[in-house]
Amino acid sequence: MQKKRNRAGPPQQEAASDDGEMSDSSDKMEVAQGKGKSAVKRAPDADEVLRPVKLSKSDLYKPPTNDELNRLKETEHLFHTNLLRMQIEELLQEVKLKEKRRKTIDGFLREINTLLGTIPETPQTDLTDQTWLPDSIKVPILQVPYQVKGKFCFLPPSSIKVVGSYLLGTCIKPEINVDLAVTMPQEILQAKDNLNQRYSRKRALYLAHIASHLANNELFSSVKFTYMNSNHLKPVLLLRPYGKDEKLVTVRIHVCPPPGFFKISRLYPNKNNVRTAWYTEQETEGVNEPPTPHYNNTILSDLTLEHHLHHLSNCASDFPGMKDAVALLKVWLHQRQLDKGYGCFNGFLAAMLISYLLSKNKINKVMSGYQVLRNTLQFLATTDLTVNGITMATSTDSSLPSLHDFHEAFQVVFVDPLGVVNLCADMTTNKYHQIQFEARESLKVLDDTSADGFHLLLMVPKPFVRTFDHVFHLTNVSKLQGTCKKMKLLNQLIDQGGDYLATSLPYVLSILSKGLGPRVALLSHTLPHRPEWDIGEEPAKHRDSSLLSVGLLLEAELHTSVLEKGPAADSSQALDFRAFWGEKSELRRFQDGSICEAVVWPGSSLCEKRKVPELIVKYLLELHADIPESCISYTGNVLDCVLTRGKEAGTEEEKMVGIIQSYDDLSRKLWNLTDLPLTVTSVQGTHPCLRYSDVFPPLPVKPDWSSYQLLREKKCLVPNPEKPCPAYVAPVKVICHMEGSGKWPQDKDAIKRVKAAFQIRLAELLRAQHQLLCNPSATHTDVYKDGYVFRVQVAYHREPQYMKEIVTPEGMLKYQDTEESLQLELETLHLPSLTSTLHGLHQQHPAFGGTSRMAKRWIHSQLLGDSFSEECVDLLVAHLFLHPAPYSPPSSPQVGFLRFLHLLATFDWKNSPLIVNLNGELKGPDYTEIQNDFISARAQLPVMFIATPKDKKDSLWTKTQPTAQILQRLIVLCLESLRALEQQLMDPSGSQDYKMTFRPPLDLYDILIRLNPKQIPRHREAVDQPAKSFFRGLLKEGAQVKDLMFPVVGYDPVQCYLQELREAYGEFALFFHDKHGGDVIGVLWKPSGFEPQPFKTTNMTGRVMDGKSAKPLLVPNVEAIVEDFEILGEGLVASVEARTERWSI
């Protein structure tokens, strides 16, 4: 048989980008003479071949030098292992710019320098007369209002200087940005150009004229505009080289005023430089002009470019550790999406912070890059710049603005060495708190000797949607204009030059922080990012900002609270509480007798309670910010829909609580049984619902007799073939350990018979003493209680030992693991212990159960559920909660599921064991032992190896499944599902069909067996709810029943059919199915099953003689096999679809 397959590998990961920062200052651009030639490779001469050096005995045992000793000590004290040091050094080598590339960039800069000097002058015109510009060029600034005083003419630059990270040697790959500061001649500017955006307009016109003369030059592949850090008052010109170096570098041209041109005291944060009458175009006599700190700061940052670069150059001289630390911090920031956009923490800010720590002796010039990184993270983690700002200024000039002045004007304060520029002017309180939070979490990772700190900190990306538990998007940013009006933010809007997003964002976040209160540990937002645009297009408007998304990191215990208790009715704060919460606030009497203001949110189920943060966000934004609910896309709980069944709303956590309560009651009854020959020593449940991780927990059932056939002698019901298959009743397994005693026999077969007697006796006593309906068998007793069926299995702790006994021909007694003994140990020892531990984990992390259920639902929906045990998935999910770095533990099932997909897709299953430290029992030496044992025995171990404190060497839950091929298939599905789902969650304008990733791709399969929904008992559990449902023989919960009959337990015709298929044809094919309501079975032929076999009676099943072969060989009888699929499933199989375009015989 030949297969016709399209091989599709996993999608290529896009290279991460790193935004070079604008480091301020300038040295004249040095023009090196000559061009570098590429080295020609040649074969080395025989004499040049490297050979091992033979050391003399004295050299071999020579004591280490001081440098070597220092390096060894540093490695011992600072790095957990020498590996971490090598990893960091390797990363720095990878991201730093190579000398060859630097020479290419230098050549490109020299040519730009020459071109800029040849741009012609223009005659002087009014600022508003822009007819001299070609029609193909648009001014890269929003000119609102358009009328402004002033004259403009273009004159060649008075200087062109390289500034920023390129000159400092701190720019990193893959996105190399080189900043060119082009200084406007003094003749272009007038004394009052600091007023009313005159300087900003002239700066933009200067850039536009440069762009018009570079646009058609063959040197450039593209000439575009963008805003520097998305600040619309600071457009820059982007130049990229033509040819193979197009992606090597982007040169950013900044226009700045001559040093010292503007009087700095006029630009202090408490000064006004934008007149209200000019901005509103209305007369406003007698109005106090508000300060314009952000506008002033924008001009000052241009003025101080050169000073900042000199400052950083002085700090970086003789300090290689600073350059390394800046590079590492840039990678760290980039992985957390903190380095781009309006109010970002970019590389320039990182370099300035390091220079501040150097000036305060928090670090010194002999420190390595790693030491500096740690100290910087420590400073960020412990210093709140929103409360206690810092300044680098050493001047004692009392006329300079104080830190208090800066705090009055800005949310985050970090003042430059001149004492006039706030380097964090555009940053919000919430964004800085996120940076603090990330720094704290990173230090924990670095201090954890069991974690791979380097990988978690610098190699794992933290996309916004995977970092926060809940995310919502503002789909129509222009609605924030109404927010500014509602909140009366005209003064702030003037300061921000009409940027209503930057104006309103801090106030909106403040309202949300107050409303959500203790429900959130962190509230942050994406950084508004305006796109680059063509020089012939109108400049990017405020509404063109990238989607504004807000993330909530929830407090696990508090975010589902439905009560917001306010102050006492007669207190002074009651009025403020009522004003804040509006009509939602009401007076309530509490159990302690107090009468207080309160807000109560709906929440009858956990599914509904998870939506409380969403209700708060939508209500407060409409009440205080005039943002209607229709403009908010809240994606925090959208995947809950895959955990609902039928018409019932909710994700059924309450059902599991009901089962656990019934189980606890049964446990007490078993403990207290009298007249048992031996006492019960423990009762332990093993069903997934007892650890809150069953995808669809058992429902309480009351069978309707009319839908069944009655076996009166057994007083139980059986399915009626004339009617739809009865509802699936899952037995909840319970292990009942009996005490050890000399009465137990010492033979495994005799023990089984004694256990069978115990099962019968248990049923009799439960019937007699507690009036419970019981159905005993040789291996278990089914107990019908509260509508649930509990399967009680008696266990004796020494039974596995007797099963291992083997008597040799010599009469020696040996102990050897057998399949039967291992299975019994798994069921009666390991599984109860694991269930108990995971039950405790759910109590600690309430999102564990929901995450595990979602993960299992997805695996089953991909038709791979039979290859992964419930316990395997539970342990994978437990790893996300016990080892969450670089994240915090998930507090919502949805974000837990995203991280589950990422873990499966990116973990190195081939070379690493996944260690799940349940109850924190594993210590440092245990990790080393597991790693070493794994490496030494890798070939004999399962492809997916999961180690726990009680299972360090065997990986019990993945011993037989999955196979390497199934795991590889799952990894590909994880990558694609994660990409598609995260794209959906971050793009509210796209498809809102979130079930898309839960629908399996069927094009892979050779045969599809379509099933009759009438005979699928779990049809209501399907991802896509069936339009038509069938009566499954169950009465409603409140229905009265005269005489209870034992329901049909564990009957699923589809599973019976699958078992028959695998037993009969497992040699030829693999069978895939979703047990949760799936109506299709995917069949994949095994290539090995189609190899001709010798003519023997053992090979006859499913085969015929090969007529084409001279020898008597057997080949599969495909037509008969496909026909058998239908015959075996008569009544259950609707059709068999042989997709012969995929295979041929």
Curated annotation (Swiss-Prot):
Its main location: nucleus. The keyword Oxidoreductase does not apply. It is found in: Nucleus, Nucleolus; Chromosome. Residues 1-46 are annotated as: Disordered. Belongs to the NRAP family. One of its GO terms (cellular component) is nucleolus. The keyword Transport does not apply. Pfam families: Nrap (PF03813), Nrap_D2 (PF17403), Nrap_D3 (PF17404), Nrap_D4 (PF17405), Nrap_D5 (PF17406), Nrap_D6 (PF17407). Keywords: Chromosome, Nucleus, RNA-binding. GO terms for biological process: ribosomal small subunit biogenesis. This is Nucleolar protein 6. One of its GO terms (molecular function) is RNA binding. Part of the small subunit (SSU) processome, first precursor of the small eukaryotic ribosomal subunit. During the assembly of the SSU processome in the nucleolus, many ribosome biogenesis factors, an RNA chaperone and ribosomal proteins associate with the nascent pre-rRNA and work in concert to generate RNA folding, modifications, rearrangements and cleavage as well as targeted degradation of pre-ribosomal RNA by the RNA exosome. The gene is nol6. InterPro entries: NOL6/Upt22, Nrap_D1, Nrap_D2, Nrap_D3, Nrap_D4, Nrap_D5, Nrap_D6. Part of the small subunit (SSU) processome, composed of more than 70 proteins and the RNA chaperone small nucleolar RNA (snoRNA) U3.
